[in-house]
Every structure is written in structure tokens, then in C-alpha cells.
Regions:
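Family-specific signature for flavin-dependent thymidylate synthase
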Residues: 1-263
Length: 265
């Protein structure tokens, strides 16, 4: 499971202005914050809006953006200046892969270290849509039988048992924490043991929320390498990329499929 909220794309005007600095071609720019009537929108691209204003990329700037984009990363520095903010809720196993993209990204996350005991654990806190279990409507053979041969345990049951254990550790942690605040020395000495139970039992399917900042160049690298990934979360992320303003800059054909040509500004 991956959920994206509060997307905001900024920096178009500055990126376009900087894109034209090398050849001092600012006079050729035809993008601006303004309202464009429907009859006049042909060739223009709506990139951003704020209150009653809209930022439209004109055909001159769009053409230059495409040519610079196709000329390679040395020429398309403007893509690093188009900044994207978003909130992502995703499982820890996906965040481990996202964290390989260190350059050009910043993230503030909900802290499992500080806030792991802030609320009771529930099944909705985990990405478990692929786990077998009759409760999920899956008619599967049991994976494990109990030693008595009476009950059957499905993968979803293992997660349920883990959640029960996490909540028991949370209950004891909060109890010992309260006693420690009142000066109980035994509680002070042992409260962290129950915190460790939660930290080390927490499955990688646990969903974490982060506020992320990245840019169009980073998204181009992600899209190229992850759009056919086996994780559903990457498919959701790449679908979101395709819905961004002027996403052709990100999702366009591979540079190796485009013949290099002289860039005219």
C-alpha cells in the first residue's frame, strides 16, 4: 500500500529563467503567471496554479525544455530546479528502497523511535493486502498446523499475533513509564526493555508517513529504474509521476533512444 497526498510543484518561473541564462535568451520566454482563455490555450501547458493565478508554459519554453531534456543531464539543470513536495504513507520495506535516492531528496518522517507507543497497533497500520488468510477472502491451504493438530495458522494470523504482542509490549511500556515518572526505581530500570520489544518486533510491512521534497531530475531517475518493479508501491508512485504537470519531461523516452543534436536557444 502506498498513499500520496498534498502534492505541490514549485519553481517553474525560476527554472525557466535560469534555463535561458546561458544564451541570454530571456526575451524569447513566453511563460507567465496569468489566466489563459480556453481558445488561446493551444500550445500552452498549465504547470501550476495559486489562488486565482495560473502558471502557463508557453510553446517557446516548452520546446526548449524538451530539447534540453533530450540533450542529457549536463544541459537540463533546470529539471533540478523544479521542486516537488508531497506526503507519502508507505511500508518500511518500500522506504528502504526509496532511501537509495539520497541526492536531491529531503524527508521528515514520523518517528518510530519516539512515537512507536503513541497509539494502539491495528491491522490498518500495516501493508498486508497480499498475505494469505481466510479473513481476507483467500481460500488457501494452511501453512502451519498447531502441535495439537486442531488449529490452522495462515500468514495473516502471524501478523495478527505480532500485533497482539506489540500491543501487550506497548501496554507494559506505558505502565512502566508512568511508574518511572513517579519515582519507581524498578520501573526506571526495566521500562526500556518493553520499548525494545516493540522496536525489534515491528514488521517491515508497518506503514510510515513522511513529508518529502525532491525534484524532476530525481523523479526521472526513479521513473526510469522503477516503473517495471515487482513492488505494487512503485507502480503507484510511477502512476503519480505521470499525473504531474508537464510529466513528459520526466517520463519521456530514454536518452539513448534520442539522437543528440545541436541545441539552439
Amino acid at each position: 500500500m502506498l498513499k500520496i497526498e498534498n502534492t505541490e510543484v514549485l519553481g517553474w518561473a525560476h527554472a525557466i529563467h535560469g534555463m535561458r541564462n546561458p544564451m541570454n535568451s530571456w526575451a524569447n520566454s513566453d511563460s507567465s503567471w496569468r489566466y489563459v482563455a480556453p481558445a488561446q490555450r493551444e500550445g500552452h501547458i498549465l504547470a501550476s496554479y495559486s489562488d486565482d493565478s495560473e502558471f502557463w508554459i508557453g510553446p517557446n519554453d516548452a520546446n526548449l525544455m524538451n530539447r534540453l531534456r533530450n540533450a542529457g543531464t549536463d544541459h537540463r539543470k533546470f529539471m533540478r530546479m523544479i521542486v516537488v513536495y508531497l506526503d507519502i504513507t508507505a511500508p518500511l520495506y518500500w522506504w528502504k528502497e526509496f532511501d537509495t535516492y539520497k541526492v536531491g531528496t529531503v524527508a521528515n518522517s514520523s518517528s518510530t523511535m519516539h512515537k512507536i507507543a503513541a497509539k494502539e497497533f491495528t491491522l490498518e497500520d500495516f501493508s498486508c493486502e497480499h498475505l494469505f488468510g481466510s479473513a481476507n477472502g483467500e481460500d488457501t491451504d494452511c501453512w502451519i498446523s498447531s502441535t495439537e493438530g486442531i488449529s490452522e495458522i495462515e500468514p495473516i494470523d502471524i501478523l495478527g499475533l505480532t500485533i497482539t504482542m506489540l500491543n501487550k509490549a506497548r501496554e507494559l511500556y506505558l505502565d512502566y513509564q508512568e511508574k518511572a515518572f513517579t519515582g519507581n526505581q524498578f520501573a526506571k530500570d526495566h521500562v526500556k526493555e518493553y520499548w525494545w520489544q516493540m522496536i525489534q518486533l515491528l514488521p517491515s510491512s508497518y506503514n510510515q508517513r513522511r513529508t518529502v521534497m525532491l525534484n524532476y531530475e530525481v523523479l526521472a531517475n526513479i521513473y526510469k529504474s522503477r516503473r517495471n518493479h515487482k513492488l505494487d508501491e512503485w507502480h503507484t508512485f510511477c502512476d503519480w509521476i505521470e499525473g504531474l504537470p508537464y510529466s513528459e519531461l520526466i517520463t519521456g523516452p530514454s536518452l539513448k533512444d534520442i539522437p543528440l543534436s545541436l541545441i539552439h536557444i
